[in-house]
Every structure is written in C-alpha cells, then in structure tokens.
C-alpha cells in the first residue's frame, strides 16, 4: 500500500499564510538510526520537521548525532521547524530562537518553554510573554501549550496565528487525557490548532482530527515504534482519515438504539389468526 499524506487542493493546511501539503508534522529525535529517520519521513510525507538546537546524542549512531544530522535534514528537503526545547526562561527562548533563525534561515519557531522537568509541562505563566517578544521580533510562532482555554486565547491575543495544545505530557503516548477541554478549545478558537505531544497511537491522531483539529505533531510514537517506518505511514493515514471524517460530518450520538433497517410492515406470519 502506498501511503501519502497529501491533502485535497480545496482543503489545505494554512499557517501564517503559508499552505502545506500535509497535516502531519514530525519530530526528528530518538530514532534508532538516521536511515530509519529518513525512511519514516519519506513514508509520512510531513508538512514540516521539528529539530532542536540543543541536541545531545545518546550514542554515536543515534539519528541526531553531529553534522550528519543536519546534512540529512537538508537532503530530505522538508521545511524545518526549529524548536526551543530545553529552554526554561524567556531569555533562553529568545536566544535559542535567534540562533535557529540564523542557522536555518527561517522565521518559523516552535516555542517550547518548560516549567517542570518531570512532566515537561509548559511554563504557562511566562509563555505568553515569550510568544509576544518573538512575534515582535518577526518570528512566526507555533507555541507548545496546555489545553487551557484562557492561555490559548492569550497566545492568540498577542499575535500567535496558531496554537499547539498537548494531548498528554511529552513522550507518554497516553493520547488525549482531557477530551472535554480539547473539544471545548476547538469550539471556542477559530485559529488553526495542532495537537502536539502525548499521542501514542494512530487512533489518537484520528480522534483529534475528527474533533476538528487542523493537524498533529508527533515524534516519540513513531521513533520508538517497533517499526518506525510503518508507524509513520499509519499516522499519515490516520490524520487523513480523521480530517475526512470531520469534513464529512459525523452522525449525532443517540441515547437509545435506533434500527438501521427500517421496518415498514409486519411479516405475514406475525399476524394474529
């Protein structure tokens, strides 16, 4: 089966005025080897690849080791979305973003400002300030945030044209742990929203796309799968399926059973004598 995450021409993903061919964004860390990373990217055909300037290789053969990784990114020819992973202060975020812009020659930045090292939860108290400063400096900011409605609204208020709420803490693979909040957030905000972090299964991605989310960003679920390449394809298909289902319009849930086959009359053998 050939997997392609291309989207219909009449239903593009648009972020900061730029149109993308896919609604899947893919991280580049923790893959067993550069070859598997490359194959997974080719299978998933993502809109963008996220990469951190604060990489530290676990082993010489890791997918993120040395200059070879940067050469691989260039060879893949997929737009790179630099991130500020590992930053714990607004000052760190600004410095890292500026270095990323110079290195990759791009105004795009995935804003990550961590407030707790155990859960990797965003620092919601300083996130809006960081986003505001980056936007004033000319960045196109995609902020990693929680599903908190007020926080996301504040990010939009300071100029973020898209937000990226988590489904669950980074790397947990638990899927949407607060469906109510995520669905409410989708209902209340009109800007593009991509679920970032915590997705573990293609069904998780399909679910949030069915709710009307505009895309997903994932990494660990593919990188740590037994077969990363096949899993990348499965997620690409799931994102497409979820988007198609959302556009098709799901039936309303019912509290009681409804016969799928209409009964227009009573069979003759049921008539009383």
From Swiss-Prot:
Keyword Transferase included in the entry's annotation: yes
Intracellular or extracellular location(s): Cytoplasm
Record-linked InterPro entries: Aldolase_TIM (IPR013785), Thiazole_synthase_ThiG (IPR033983), ThiG (IPR008867)
Keyword Secreted among record annotations: no
Keywords: Cytoplasm, Schiff base, Thiamine biosynthesis, Transferase
A Gene Ontology term for the protein's cellular component: cytoplasm
Pathway membership: Cofactor biosynthesis; thiamine diphosphate biosynthesis
Ranges where the record places region Disordered: 251-273
GO MF annotations in UniProt: thiazole synthase activity
Major site of localization recorded for this protein: cytoplasm
Enzyme active site: 110
Reaction catalysed by this enzyme: [ThiS sulfur-carrier protein]-C-terminal-Gly-aminoethanethioate + 2-iminoacetate + 1-deoxy-D-xylulose 5-phosphate = [ThiS sulfur-carrier protein]-C-terminal Gly-Gly + 2-[(2R,5Z)-2-carboxy-4-methylthiazol-5(2H)-ylidene]ethyl phosphate + 2 H2O + H(+)
Pfam family, one: ThiG
GO BP terms, alphabetized: thiamine diphosphate biosynthetic process
Role of this protein: Catalyzes the rearrangement of 1-deoxy-D-xylulose 5-phosphate (DXP) to produce the thiazole phosphate moiety of thiamine. Sulfur is provided by the thiocarboxylate moiety of the carrier protein ThiS. In vitro, sulfur can be provided by H(2)S.
The family this protein is said to belong to: Belongs to the ThiG family.
The protein, known as: Thiazole synthase
UniProt organism field: Variovorax paradoxus (strain S110)
Gene: thiG
